Amino acid sequence: MSPSDWRMRIQDILESIQKIQEYTEGASLESLQADRKTVDAVVRNLTIIGEATRHVPVEIQTRYPAIPWDDMRDMRNVVVHEYLRVSYPILWRTIQSNLPPLVEQLKGILRDAERDQ
């Protein structure tokens, strides 16, 4: 993978987080559970996040251990393979608590990569 390819994957993750945040803005756990279309859109973007994570080189993942790379991949596996049993509280916690801090962390990786070129 060329150096720019993994940066594109980080950008894909950021775009998917942004979409999830847009889709769920103003929502609650209860309203999310009642809105299957939004759940499907969120699950699709969590899948993209997990898949994109697989394409970030191990060296980059090792350099940034505070980012939950394994959890991002694992969530993809859950929503793809256990899609009928996705836990709404876990999905909601991911949306509300886990994704927001990733935005600045991932932007920091892109800034570091730009600086190191």
Task: Give a label for each model feature.
Residues 1-117:
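Solvent-exposed interaction patches of small proteins and small membrane subunits
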